[in-house]
Amino acid sequence: MTIIRKKHPLIKIINHSFIDLPAPSNISSWWNFGSLLGLCLAIQILTGLFLAMHYTSDTATAFSSVAHICRDVNYGWLIRYMHANGASMFFICLFLHVGRGIYYGSYNMIETWNMGIILLFAVMATAFMGYVLPWGQMSFWGATVITNLLSAIPYVGTTLVEWIWGGFSVDKATLTRFFAFHFILPFIITALVLVHLLFLHETGSNNPTGLNSDADKIPFHPYYTIKDFLGVLILLMAFMILTLFFPDILGDPDNYTPANPLNTPPHIKPEWYFLFAYAILRSIPNKLGGVLALVLSILVLALMPLLHTSKQRALTFRPITQTMYWILVADLLILTWIGGQPVEYPFIIIGQTASIAYFTIIMILMPIAGMIENNILDLD
């Protein structure tokens, strides 16, 4: 068996990636989220495939086909709710994975980090298009509002929006193409994940100290396969509790009303995992400025390697930057809350303050804190 594992041209790739891979001996549970994201992706592709067997991407029948899946298909309700809540679990793991990367300075592995940002954009695009497919009120109006943001692009904006819509409004053509893209993107994401792993295995994993761990490595299997399996069990338990006991807690009641272009819901808002970006978008009165801020809220992550001023990699031994980091986490929670609130006083001013704080902490305060810590520790 060992000979096949190490000699077979295909199996040896798996062997070098998941079995004999040298891994730091001290990586904590924060390093579990990569494998959990892989599990989430697998769940989403499988449940999505079964949903696609019964779904029809036509404005006249899309809503009914989802109802049919829930009522008439064997365990259709379970597949549908696993897919809907699987997206939420996916984003919870994504945010924790990115948060871990920021805390421990993993962004210094630039290729891996940039690939991760591309993956984040791809997953967000996939989730957005998936939200449109049930063709409920929030699906329709969410698609209208978000795609309409592209009209803020000078000169080509309006043409671009109509090109994406396939007409003069969100309609049958839009739904059909969104279904096509929503189906193909997870497979593209899978390919990007392999590239992400390829880049990671070029440098090796980071660890909680942020120090070089070449002198202290252990094989990935059995140590981290067992550890990852524990993470998988915990995630699946949380996931099934959410899916079986509280399937609608993260959804919007408006999406149980069929899409109606003549009736606008009182509060148009995306799914919870986009609310922080939506709050940043709404906090700027100018349309183009809002769109730029929305894109920058994610793209600012690409600047992190350039903004790293500390002589240390991780925040483990850097209390000042640690404080900034946790303020940033609190700020993101505030933005998520604001994104779900109506556009009125005091929510507008809170959203604007939190948006300014978000960019200020990442681009100004954390680099300054890094320099201060260098001086305190005489690391210059």
Swiss-Prot record:
Membrane topology designation: Multi-pass membrane protein
Binding-site list for heme b b562: 83, 182
Chain ranges passing through the membrane: 33-53, 77-98, 113-133, 178-198, 226-246, 288-308, 320-340, 347-367
Cofactor(s) this protein requires: heme b
Cofactor binding annotation: Binds 2 heme b groups non-covalently.
Pfam families: Cytochrom_B_C (PF00032), Cytochrome_B (PF00033)
Metal-binding recorded as keyword: yes
Main subcellular location of this protein, as a coarse class: mitochondrion
SUPFAM superfamilies reported for this sequence: a domain/subunit of cytochrome bc1 complex (Ubiquinol-cytochrome c reductase), Transmembrane di-heme cytochromes
MF (Gene Ontology): metal ion binding; ubiquinol-cytochrome-c reductase activity
Keywords: Electron transport, Heme, Iron, Membrane, Metal-binding, Mitochondrion, Mitochondrion inner membrane, Respiratory chain, Transmembrane, Transmembrane helix, Transport, Ubiquinone
PANTHER family found in the cross-reference section: CYTOCHROME B
Complex formation: The cytochrome bc1 complex contains 11 subunits: 3 respiratory subunits (MT-CYB, CYC1 and UQCRFS1), 2 core proteins (UQCRC1 and UQCRC2) and 6 low-molecular weight proteins (UQCRH/QCR6, UQCRB/QCR7, UQCRQ/QCR8, UQCR10/QCR9, UQCR11/QCR10 and a cleavage product of UQCRFS1). This cytochrome bc1 complex then forms a dimer.
UniProt name for this protein: Cytochrome b
Organism (species): Microtus liechtensteini (Liechtenstein's pine vole)
Gene name for this UniProt entry: MT-CYB
